[in-house]
């Protein structure tokens, strides 16, 4: 028996990551890139990998500022700068994530800083942007297109009809709803409490 061979098993995190990645084809990633640059930033998308374009956090901060301005009319909500220093880039990514959380993106659809900066989980980065587009579209339908299906709106529950008058007599037991017990009690049903029972 050989112990050198690696077991053919994967962790749950790895399985979930692969499942997420399978949902984003190159075409889907390109659509996300178009949404970020053309639809929101009104810029020409640079060539190359989308994650590399987003890695320094400047594009994400500009994206957040535009969405914030559309809501409040205030510009430059997040300060940013082009920098090659890792801690500056990661801080800018973190600021974008804080904005997205307040904007409405669910916690389970938000990536972590290292998912983008170290490319640990590209799919969740794409999922965050896709989710952000849905919330932006919900708030400003005419300005920001949506990636994928729109957010569903919760429909109010239909009104519950009140009970008929013959069921509203205030009794604790309704024979119309629960049946008639025919005066059942412990004595009539042979229920013995605290005494010996003979089971035949």
Swiss-Prot record:
Residues 151-164 are annotated as: Interaction with SH3 domain of ABP1. One of its GO terms (biological process) is actin filament organization. Residues 154-165 have a biased composition (Basic residues). One of its GO terms (cellular component) is actin cortical patch. It comes from the Eukaryota. SUPFAM superfamilies: Calponin-homology domain, CH-domain. One of its GO terms (molecular function) is protein-macromolecule adaptor activity. InterPro entries: Calponin-like (IPR050606), CH_dom (IPR001715), CH_dom_sf (IPR036872), SM22_calponin (IPR003096). The keyword Zinc does not apply. It is found in: Cytoplasm, Cytoskeleton, Actin patch. The modification N-acetylserine is found at residue 2. Keywords: Acetylation, Cytoplasm, Cytoskeleton, Phosphoprotein. Residues 144-168 are annotated as: Disordered. The modification Phosphoserine is found at residue 11. Changing residue 185 to D: Moderately reduces actin-binding and actin-bundling activity. Residues 26-136 form the Calponin-homology (CH) domain. Its main location: cytoplasm. PANTHER family: CALPONIN, TRANSGELIN. Binds to actin. Interacts with ABP1. Present with 1578 molecules/cell in log phase SD medium. Has actin-binding and actin-bundling activity. Stabilizes actin filaments against disassembly. This is Transgelin.
């Amino acid at each position: 028996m050989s112990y050198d061979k690696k077991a053919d098993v994967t962790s749950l995190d790895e399985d979930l990551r692969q499942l997420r990645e399978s949902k984003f084809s190159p075409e889907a990633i390109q659509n996300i890139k178009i949404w970020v640059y053309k639809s929101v930033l009104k810029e020409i998308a640079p060539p190359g990998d989308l994650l590399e374009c987003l890695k320094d956090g400047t594009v994400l901060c500009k994206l957040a500022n535009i969405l914030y301005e559309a809501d409040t009319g205030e510009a430059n909500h997040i300060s940013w700068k082009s920098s090659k220093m890792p801690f500056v880039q990661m801080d800018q990514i973190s600021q974008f994530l804080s904005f997205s959380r307040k904007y409405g993106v669910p916690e389970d659809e938000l990536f972590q800083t290292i998912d983008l900066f170290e490319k640990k989980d590209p799919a969740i980065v794409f999922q965050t942007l896709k989710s952000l587009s849905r919330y932006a579209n919900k708030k400003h339908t005419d300005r920001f297109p949506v990636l994928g299906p729109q957010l569903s709106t919760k429909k109010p529950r239909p009104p519950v009809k009140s009970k008929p008058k013959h069921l509203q007599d205030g009794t604790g037991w309704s024979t119309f709803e629960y049946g008639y017990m025919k005066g059942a009690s412990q004595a009539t049903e042979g229920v013995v409490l605290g005494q010996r029972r003979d089971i035949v």
